[in-house]
């Protein structure tokens, strides 16, 4: 299977994988509205891949088969200062 990968111009580091190029019929309208105008990044031969950057390849393949799309969102931003305070047991109260 070769899937199409699109990036969002509205949401940084957000990618939408669909089964075929320019076929968004199975993607919910609300998601497309939030995602904005999709910009094609690449056509990806997903069957020949063992892994992807940030996404679980098995989950991507399963969701493409079941839902017709997979949405990859960026990992949550970690506040390093707050994490450090927590690690050292700092409590301002």
From Swiss-Prot:
The residue ranges of the YcgL domain are: 1-85
PROSITE patterns membership: YCGL
Source species of the chain = Shewanella piezotolerans (strain WP3 / JCM 13877)
Which Gene3D superfamilies does the entry mention? YcgL domain
| Highest taxon of the lineage | Bacteria
Name one matching Pfam family.
YcgL
Q: Can you say what this protein is called?
A: YcgL domain-containing protein swp_2294
What HAMAP family is this protein classified in? UPF0745 (MF_01866)
InterPro entries for the chain:
YcgL-like_sf, YcgL_dom
